[in-house]
Regions:
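Structured C-terminal helix/loop/strand segments within mature extracytoplasmic catalytic/sensor domains
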Residues: 10-17, 43, 318-447
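Active-site-adjacent helix/loop patches that line small-molecule binding or acyl-intermediate pockets
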Residues: 96-118, 123-125, 178-299, 307-310
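Active-site SXXK
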Residues: 152, 165-185, 312, 380
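Conserved ankyrin/ankyrin-like repeat signature
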Residues: 452, 484-485, 517-518
């Protein structure tokens, strides 16, 4: 199985650690009631219950440290030792301790989803895809599920680590890559945006002689033709493969050459479709049809497991930013277009029914996988090879129905309000949790953690929110002398003239602390610098 992180150094225990109040407060918060110390196993359990797994790159050093503590037979962590671990990812610790992830009660949610998954295991019917000989060899009893939140909380069930052929799920990412490289106008001159009303491999075009959409074979072949058309075959595929690796946070992604050869040898329909496309001017004049088809078959022959595919889905749910690496892979506009097409066209001839019943973007493949995206919340991948008459996983569809019967994930659940149903929003927040997120923002400002501030603001935290004393994140950053925090807040709409309940502004806090560079920054902003980027 692919490792998402490298091991930490052999000894990561510094001899001196500077303690700050946060460590002591969180140490006490994480201790079990009645205990006088925090054990390495208790800390590991806090991470596990929050959905932060051992192969999460954000927690790599933390788990390595706890493993070494286990090997040393340590039964407790001192506050000083805890500070070492805390310093590896302070913002992650804060959010785990205060249960402020997007799904607050993750362990309860994961247990409930596991029950839905197991109840659908007995769903019978369907047949494993036989028109690609290599796929026909996959055992019909395989069944796996993984989920990943936009905060990187993860859980796996069944055969979630077993590799499967992604097939048509590849169309989503090929479309995203082509869209970013060719641009919206150029790409959609050649590919439409409408459901076709025909089967996924139908030899048909829209009235403008284009494939109806990028989620059917014709559209995906044209998408592939627009990806780095001037590069060599190996360079083009490496580019797509590397993009999948980024989306999966360097998780399990591979290429199955046997599936590729099997698919190419049984691809008469796709060859006919490609030459039909060329006859109707769907390709540029320079396009090599045979090479484009090989490229398309290669993309379909990528293999992943549910674990990695769920991270891909969560990256799309997170607007193109990978929740495990914080790397932006696609622009938010690209993701918006992709999710729109997944919602209307992603499930073959069942797309309309899926949109009506389930109500979230999804893409299936004849390998038995379904990638499901709940925007701003979660990504799922469910895999089971037996397919229904539409080419969708039988157990996968049943799982999705069970999921949305329990949870309010349908895109339009928001308009029903309190309609008497007992469906649950697992991300629902209360006032105390919103207050905790404001505390997170102030903490990040105090420590100069710009990435954490960006994440919190992107998730909806008010940059100008104040505590009961009227103090904002800008007050805190100015008091602590955090120049870059102040700069970020001012550049993003921070109100520099807000006063706390004692009548103090942030600039007065900076003056009192003799933080002269920050005072100068405030002066530049007040005298017209708000129109500039306030660069250092």
């Amino acid at each position: 199985m692919s490792k998402r992180h490298s091991p930490a150094p052999a000894d990561d225990r510094p001899s001196v650690v500077q303690l700050v109040p946060d460590e002591a407060r969180l140490y006490n918060l994480l201790m079990e009631p009645g205990e006088t110390s925090l054990s390495p196993e208790q800390l590991r359990e806090h991470f596990r219950r929050s959905g932060i797994l051992a192969d999460d790159p954000r927690a790599a050093g933390i788990y390595d440290y706890l493993d070494k503590a286990r090997q040393r037979n340590e039964t407790s962590l001192s506050v000083t030792e805890f500070a070492v671990v805390f310093a590896m990812n302070p913002s992650l610790f804060m959010r785990i301790a205060e249960d402020s992830m997007v799904v607050p009660a993750w362990s309860d949610f994961a247990r409930s989803v596991g029950k839905i998954f197991n109840e659908r295991r007995s769903s019978n019917g369907g047949k494993v895809a036989a028109y690609i000989p290599e796929l026909a060899r996959v055992p019909a009893d395989r069944y796996g599920l993984s989920m990943c939140s936009v905060d990187g909380q993860r859980a796996h069930y069944g055969d979630a680590q077993e590799m499967f052929s992604i097939q048509s799920i590849s169309k989503t990412i090929s479309y995203c890559i082509a869209l970013e490289e060719a641009g919206n106008e150029r790409l959609h001159e050649r590919i439409g945006r409408e459901p076709s009303g025909h089967s996924f491999n139908a030899i048909t075009l829209d009235p403008r002689r284009r494939p109806h959409n990028p989620m059917i074979n014709a559209g995906a072949i044209v998408s592939c033709s627009l990806i780095r058309p001037g590069d060599s075959a190996s360079a083009r595929f490496s580019h797509v493969f590397d993009t999948w690796k980024k989306l999966a946070a360097n998780g399990a992604v591979s290429f199955n050459n046997t599936v590729f050869l099997s698919e190419r040898d049984s691809a008469d329909r796709n060859f006919a479709l490609a030459y039909f496309l060329r006859e109707n001017g769907a390709f540029s004049k320079e396009t090599n049809v045979a090479a484009t088809l090989d490229f398309y078959f290669q993309c379909c022959s990528i293999e992943m497991n549910c674990d990695s595919m769920a991270v891909v889905a969560a990256t799309l749910a997170n607007g193109g930013v990978n929740p495990l690496t914080n790397e932006r892979v696609f622009s938010s506009g690209t993701v918006k277009h992709c999710l729109s097409l997944m919602h209307s066209c992603g499930m073959y001839d069942f797309s309309g029914e899926f949109a009506f019943l389930i109500g979230v973007p999804a893409k299936s493949g004849v390998g038995g996988g379904i990638m499901v995206v709940v925007p701003e919340k979660l990504g799922f991948c469910v895999w089971s090879p037996p397919l229904d008459e539409n080419g969708n996983s039988v157990r996968g569809i049943e799982f999705c129905k069970g999921l949305t019967s329990m949870y309010s994930f349908h895109n339009f659940d928001i308009v029903t309000g309190h309609d008497g149903s007992e469906r649950i929003d697992p991300t629902r927040r209360n006032v105390s949790l919103d207050n905790a997120r404001h505390v997170d923002l102030c903490w990040a400002a105090m420590h100069g953690d710009i990435k954490e501030m960006q994440r919190l603001v992107a998730s909806g935290v008010n940059l100008n929110g104040a505590d009961y004393d009227g103090r904002t994140a800008l007050h805190i950053a100015a008091s602590e002398g955090k120049l870059e925090s102040v700069r970020y807040i001012l550049q993003n709409g921070g109100q520099f003239d807000r006063v706390d309940r004692w009548g103090n502004s942030a600039v007065q806090d900076a003056e009192r602390g003799e933080h002269h560079a920050i005072v100068a920054l405030f002066e530049a902003f007040a005298s017209g610098g708000r129109k500039t980027r306030l660069s250092a």
